[in-house]
Amino acid sequence: MAETRTDAEIAQNYKAMGDSVDLIQSIVTEKKNADGELMVMQNATDAEKKERVNINVGYIEYMKALTDWKGNEDWTDVDKAITDGKAYVG
């Protein structure tokens, strides 16, 4: 049986999932900075970007499937990142 996470670990994991969501959305939407440059993975190939998105989608899917969440988490952005990420990867 898996060890139950502490409240601090759950909060840290939820924040880490948010970081993955931000990364996925930045890649998928080709988010740019004020200078018009891509904010993440500027010099990466499409294959490298897809690999990064795929890894992060897998991570947030795994984390969301854990059963010891508190029940007050908002999964809206996570679900959108999963859907958008899978569509991007193809």
Label for each model-derived stretch:
Residues M1-G90:
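Beta-rich interaction/scaffold domains
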